[in-house]
Amino acid sequence: MRVLHIANFYGDKSGGIRTTIHNLGHSYIQRGHEFTFIVPGTGFYCEETPTGRMIHLPSIILPFSGGYRIIRRNKDVRNLITTLKPDVIEISDRFTLSQIGPWAKKRNIPAVVFSHETLSGLVKTHLKLSLTRFVNWHNRR
């Protein structure tokens, strides 16, 4: 089976999403499946890893996030899906990649979303941090 996992917010500092993807990839490969994961990067490039093929897509840094990136164009993701022809798609972001599920459904590609966060948790963590940074910046001017 060809499994494709797509995630924004994957990077050197990410913990849960990165760990989840690596554990999934390791398990799929042990069971004889092909595992590819698409993540944000500084450009387009591929690399083979012990946990599967990692494809980086051009991305932008999300302001006030501590360096997290999001894939710049979902069209690039859709084009890769068409090229890779996965049997199933796993999505690790229900916000910025939300259009991928309905798009895949129209093409009869099963898709599932992994929710690593709650909206209230995101607001509590990131909005508070962003506001604090903004206020501190403003006060230093």
Please tell me what each predicted stretch does.
Residues 1-56, 82:
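N-terminal subdomain of nucleotide-sugar transferases
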Residues 9-12, 60-62, 120:
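A short, flexible beta-alpha/helix-coil linker loop
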Residues 46, 120-124:
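A short beta-to-alpha transition loop/helix N-cap that caps and shapes the active-site region
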Residues 49, 101-104, 126:
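Short amphipathic alpha-helical segments
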Residues 52-79, 127-133:
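A short, charged, and often flexible helix/loop element on the N-terminal side
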Residues 80-87:
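Glycine-rich phosphate-binding loop signature in dinucleotide/nucleotide-binding domains
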Residues 89-121:
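An aromatic- and histidine-rich active-site surface loop
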Residues 106, 119, 133-141:
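Membrane-proximal helix-turn-helix segments that form the acceptor-binding/catalytic region
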